[in-house]
């Protein structure tokens, strides 16, 4: 039995899996070895053969979960984990060679903590426009800038995190949050789990020296993608509030009307600007307001139709 496991779920990851799998092949093995679990979440591209061809070079178990949803896929993989530490990541992440050894060392050095996060930095697959570096929120790319040490649960992010198996216990990822095939999904898939674990008494630690690279594709370097991300994150904040009691309070109607009026005024003022960054910054609040509104409406409908 392996000493620790690495688990990720992938849907149509053919564009980013090759560099990720190359990096996984170069990993230093921790004492006791390791197991890699990849869950193909209904891919329609060449993800399945890409994974199969690496099984001879990696301690890789490939599972299939056709029901769409990242958390659905992760839950399907949890039954296959081995060892006392589980590292979670995504299909577009390049870890450093000492990744497994570093997480093992960290877990051994911090016995009072059960949830661990590493730093995340972007690896641009195309040069980012200047306005993105100036104006785009780093969180939209899962780009972290935290100090090492104890940290609050919301700062543990899915591309680079580990959880003690004993803390995980019978907990599973909530399948009603996170990527699910819809453009307007609610973000926060791993955060929801970490918040539950923290509520059960498990503490979080961040290690700034365990750095994984997040592959950023050209399609993510557009205002359209970033605004969709703003919308999704706003939905996620409200969804987390419903699931964990940790979301934003509802605005009084008059205040909400005022926020909309201000957002529309800024958008109109900047619509003819020659600076795409200025246009994005003007459009972002409106995208977030719409995400917040749509999620609250969806929850209200759910309550009305509940038995």
Language model regions located:
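A conserved acidic beta->alpha catalytic loop
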Residues: 40-49, 93
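Glycine-rich, basic loop-to-helix element that forms the pyrophosphate-binding segment
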Residues: 65-81
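Short, well-formed alpha-helical segments that are part of the catalytic scaffolds
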Residues: 13-26
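A short, conserved alpha-helix in the catalytic core of glycosyltransferases
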Residues: 160-163, 167, 171, 179-210
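Short aromatic/hydrophobic "clamp" motif used to bind/position activated sugar donors
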Residues: 86
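Short, flexible, basic/aromatic active-site loop/helix in glycosyltransferases
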Residues: 135-154
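Conserved donor NDP-sugar-binding/catalytic core segment of glycosyltransferases
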Residues: 98-131
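Non-catalytic, C-terminal membrane-associated alpha-helical segments of glycosyltransferases
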Residues: 228-235, 245-307
């Amino acid at each position: 039995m392996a000493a620790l496991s690495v688990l990720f779920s992938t849907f149509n990851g053919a564009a980013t899996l090759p560099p990720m799998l190359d990096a996984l092949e170069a990993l230093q093995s921790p004492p006791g070895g390791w197991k890699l679990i990849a869950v193909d979440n209904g891919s329609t591209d060449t993800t399945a053969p890409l994974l199969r061809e690496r099984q001879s070079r990696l301690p890789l178990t490939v599972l299939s979960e056709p029901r769409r949803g990242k958390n659905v896929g992760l839950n399907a993989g949890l039954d296959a984990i081995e060892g006392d530490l589980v590292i979670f990541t995504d299909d577009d992440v390049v870890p450093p060679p000492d990744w497994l050894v570093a997480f093992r060392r960290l877990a051994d050095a911090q016995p009072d903590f059960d949830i661990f996060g590493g730093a995340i930095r972007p690896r641009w697959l195309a040069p980012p426009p200047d306005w993105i570096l100036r104006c785009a929120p780093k969180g939209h790319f899962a780009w972290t800038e935290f100090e090492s040490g104890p940290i609050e649960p919301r700062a543990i992010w899915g591309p680079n995190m580990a959880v003690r198996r004993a803390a995980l216990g019978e907990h599973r990822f909530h399948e009603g949050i996170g990527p699910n095939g819809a453009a307007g999904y609610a973000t926060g898939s791993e955060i929801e789990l970490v918040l539950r674990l923290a509520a059960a008494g498990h503490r979080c630690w961040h290690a700034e020296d365990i750095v994984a690279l997040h592959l950023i594709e050209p399609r993510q370097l557009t205002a359209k993608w970033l605004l969709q991300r703003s919308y999704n994150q706003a939905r996620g904040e409200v969804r987390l509030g419903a699931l964990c009691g940790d979301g934003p309070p509802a605005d009084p109607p008059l205040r909400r009307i005022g926020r909309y009026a201000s957002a529309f005024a800024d958008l109109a003022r900047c619509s003819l600007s020659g600076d795409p960054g200025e246009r994005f910054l003007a459009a972002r609040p409106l995208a977030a307001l719409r995400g917040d509104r749509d999620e609250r409406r969806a929850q209200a409908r759910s309550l009305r139709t509940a038995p």
